[in-house]
Amino acid sequence: DTEGANYFRYPDSSANWREIYPNGYRPISEGENRDLQIVAGARGQWGDWDYDASLDYGRNDFTYRLRNSLNASLGPGSTTRFKTGDFAFAQTVGNFDLTRVFDAAGATHTFGTGAEFRREQYRTHAGDPASYAAGPFTDRPTGSQAGGGLTPQDEADLSRNVASVYANVSSQFGDKFSTDLAGRYEHYQDFGSQWTGKLAARYAFAPAFALRGAVSNNVRAPSLSQIGYEATSTGYDAAGRLTQGRLLSVNNPIARA
């Protein structure tokens, strides 16, 4: 678990009620982190090939809380502890690899190929209603101090499948020269397909001196948290009217309009 201090709110600040904190206050952030991982696998030989198969499940849950805080717009009766949101990410990965060593064209080659399937899930849940509420005191800031909570409209529930196949060959030509060639095809359910590859070579002029060069390309798909995270901030303008600002995900209909 983690804990952090935020900046100090002075006694005469609009973000404070003296009835709660006569001398001002410093909100404390609390993070509760929980991890789970289960792995199963098998390896062995299949004819001239070595195989390695695995199934991996991992999950991370994070709860964000505040203590020694308040929602000034709720008045002197505001609570001082809040849960501002829950975040969860889970991933299941199945993997199967084959490897074989053989000699050809005056070199020793190590050839590998395999396939992978990945299932990703991302969820967020709203915080306590008091953590994002806009109370009756319109001249005071809304939401819990040191970070307003996620609202129900900010909640996300996303998942996707990712499948890939790949192959690589490493070749050793004598004692000095070696090459590596690799390629990978990956398909994201929500992002599309991509090809990536790499070519590298190394020449050893002496035991203590060698040159190596490589060329490759890479594509990184955005994570589900980058795609799906949303947040809302609520406040009052100078006339006491309720206003709202939102951080929208890329798939939100408002953002795509």
Predicted features and spans:
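Solvent-exposed loop/turn segments connecting transmembrane beta-strands
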Residues: 159, 163, 186-196, 218
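Short, intrinsically disordered, charge-balanced linker/junction segments flanking boundaries
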Residues: 2-6, 40, 100, 134, ...
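Feature captures outer-membrane beta-barrel proteins of Gram-negative bacteria and organelles
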Residues: 165-171, 194-206
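Surface-exposed extracellular loop regions of Gram-negative outer-membrane beta-barrel proteins
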Residues: 59-63, 68, 119-128, 189, ...
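Outer-membrane beta-barrel transmembrane domain signature of Gram-negative proteins
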Residues: 25-39, 45, 57, 69-178
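Transmembrane beta-barrel wall of Gram-negative outer-membrane proteins
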Residues: 1-8, 14-23, 27-47
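Transmembrane beta-strands of outer-membrane beta-barrel proteins
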Residues: 1, 51-55, 109-113, 179-181, ...
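Flexible, surface-exposed loop regions and adjacent strand-edge segments
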Residues: 3-17, 67-77, 127-137, 197-200, ...
